[in-house]
């Protein structure tokens, strides 16, 4: 049996919506937002009414009868660490999101918007595989100092969607296979997936792992400490050096990998060096994750927007295909992944979890 599900993905510069009947898209829309539209809002929570109006306007424009919906699902925001899966939106979850208890991000609005519409219709609301999915094995949490534990913050939704898709194509199930999955986008996360759980992964948000188009990844600690106490930067500015103005932006002044690739093909030496270094660091992280899985790997999967770049992926393949076959699953369809998680629950294939 197929179900009608509305999916909601609020991002920092867009609101993405779609209605599915089973795995068929009935309609899909991406509404882009300008900085001017958000100028009067002091924080993400103040955007709620604005995003609600966007949601209603899009649904009305397509003429869809919301009374046909069986469930609503929103992008999972910054919550306490949880295992992967599909979660019912609860008052406890909403309280943590509204108070930004674990951080502020546009995705925090996903569950809130889903809950409001679902309650009006008397149907369930969910989130699926939020970025705080934490399935790390205990040994992976050691950082090297007891004051700091390693955290699992990564592109869990796309990782697990890609893992499920490739496992099915290989005639098996995600929960029965071992993968190293690399999400390549504005942030880069590489995880060791052992039989359905991401047992080790770099923290793609807070300065860990490979550098990306706009994030620094891991930095030499003492040199960064010197920068912290030099008096040249505020805490906010230093944070931007890690997330927002790190990586390719710091080296080449742009986070557009299309621009970087054009420079590489034009023979720009600085671009070539930085491009090769990013591919090198991703490859090295993949190698590290292969050790986590004791070399027993069914496939290495490259996904995310950057996986569309043949030049970039070819460099990773060249350095890692001796470990295992490399499969490219380009892009990220978060709306489809959200829908799939809810369809599995509604069909009784999986059981929903409670936050």
Curated annotation (Swiss-Prot):
Enzyme Commission number(s): 2.7.2.7
Main location: cytoplasm
Enzyme class (EC, first level): transferase
Subcellular location: Cytoplasm
PROSITE patterns in alphabetical order: ACETATE_KINASE_1, ACETATE_KINASE_2
GO MF term list: acetate kinase activity; ATP binding; butyrate kinase activity
A single BP term in Gene Ontology: acetate metabolic process
Name the record gives this protein: Probable butyrate kinase
Upper taxonomic lineage: Bacteria, Bacillati, Bacillota, Bacilli, Bacillales
